[in-house]
């Protein structure tokens, strides 16, 4: 009996040591930190293919990615994959916010693994992400941002949680699955003037979207709210027991991919940043658009940001518009809509043309008789041979 107890105690100690190693990221395959990104093409360099974007002229300075801080709110199907992609890209710092735990029901989605069931999502995500890239700094918060106390702390961290403590984050990403949390993020970012991106997947799992929101410049989430928000309907009353939204890892992977792609374009200043990009998996349709802010938005901070944006735009120096004269088009008015423009200059035309008769205004000649060039003084003597004789001479040649 005593031997069994001692064996169990030994096993407990081993498990505790293993748990400590996992928490600290100390296990096989864990690499050391890399101080400086390198474009050297070797198997041991995790950044060589990322730095190739610079060599190919896509990104001017990819190393700048390490100077940015991004906050990801919601570490579920979209948020966890978003955090993983940013980690692999070498982002400087990630702030993760979520209050949920990993469940076996999450395994149909990406990132999390069965042995992480029971852990908080932010804790499980941090452990995995540190092993993927130890160069990234992580800050995790396991709470619901919609409560009063937590909301104030959330605002404090996105306004002071940058790489340089006391500086704001560069971007906030909303990857939550409910409108209450979206409205909380919207309110916080409007009050702080913080640029953020919103994302979501439909309940039937076959469509999704991303949206870039610049307070005062573009429509916020409250400017054109969904019916559930506009009608002040409690989301909990819409959910029946035993009924849940559908979930496809493919759709969530696509939405996370276009979200991070938009983040990289925004932070590293390349390509065209999308203000709104939708995804419909049924027709493989990707609609895009940009929405202006609503002057009667219910969010007072949004209206305030709109006024400040108008003042900034009015203070900018006006750019002078250069008027470009259009070339004269010949034969513009005809039944076939044909526009014919001469490629010959007027000087060349005059030199090659003969005398032009006097015609009424608006009438032009179709062609002119070319000027006859003077003949040379060389004269060919007449041989007085007939045509038949000349043909016979040619046959003998």
Swiss-Prot record:
Residue ranges annotated as motif UFC1-binding sequence (UFC): 382-397
CDD domains referenced in this protein's UniProt entry, alphabetically: ThiF_MoeB_HesA_family (cd00757)
GO terms of biological process kind: erythrocyte differentiation; megakaryocyte differentiation; protein K69-linked ufmylation; protein ufmylation; response to endoplasmic reticulum stress; reticulophagy
Chain segments carrying region Linker: 342-372
A GO molecular-function annotation: UFM1 activating enzyme activity
Binding positions for Zn(2+) per the UniProt entry: 220, 223, 297, 302
Record key words, sorted: ATP-binding, Cytoplasm, Endoplasmic reticulum, Golgi apparatus, Membrane, Metal-binding, Nucleotide-binding, Nucleus, Ubl conjugation pathway, Zinc
Main localization category: cytoplasm
Classification via Gene3D superfamilies: NAD(P)-binding Rossmann-like Domain (3.40.50.720)
Pfam families: ThiF (PF00899)
Protein name from the UniProt record: Ubiquitin-like modifier-activating enzyme 5
Domain of life (superkingdom): Eukaryota
Gene Ontology, cellular component aspect: cytoplasm; cytosol; endoplasmic reticulum membrane; Golgi apparatus; nucleus
InterPro entries linked: D-isomer_DH_CS1, ThiF/MoeB/HesA, ThiF_NAD_FAD-bd, Ubiquitin-activating_enz
Subcellular location: Cytoplasm; Nucleus; Endoplasmic reticulum membrane; Golgi apparatus
Free-text comment about domains: The UFC1-binding sequence (UFC) motif mediates interaction with UFC1. The linker region is required to activate the active site of UFC1: it region moves next to active site of UFC1 to reduce the amount of water molecules in the vicinity of UFC1's active site and thereby elevate the nucleophilic activity of UFC1 active site.
Subunit structure: Homodimer; homodimerization is required for ufm1 activation. Interacts (via UIS motif) with ufm1; binds ufm1 via a trans-binding mechanism in which ufm1 interacts with distinct sites in both subunits of the uba5 homodimer. Interacts (via C-terminus) with ufc1.
Active site: 244
Family: Belongs to the ubiquitin-activating E1 family. UBA5 subfamily.
Annotated positions binding ATP: 77, 98, 121, 144, 178
Function (record text): E1-like enzyme which specifically catalyzes the first step in ufmylation. Activates ufm1 by first adenylating its C-terminal glycine residue with ATP, and thereafter linking this residue to the side chain of a cysteine residue in E1, yielding a ufm1-E1 thioester and free AMP. Activates ufm1 via a trans-binding mechanism, in which ufm1 interacts with distinct sites in both subunits of the uba5 homodimer. Trans-binding also promotes stabilization of the uba5 homodimer, and enhances ATP-binding. Transfer of ufm1 from uba5 to the E2-like enzyme UFC1 also takes place using a trans mechanism.
Motif (UFM1-interacting sequence (UIS)): 329-341
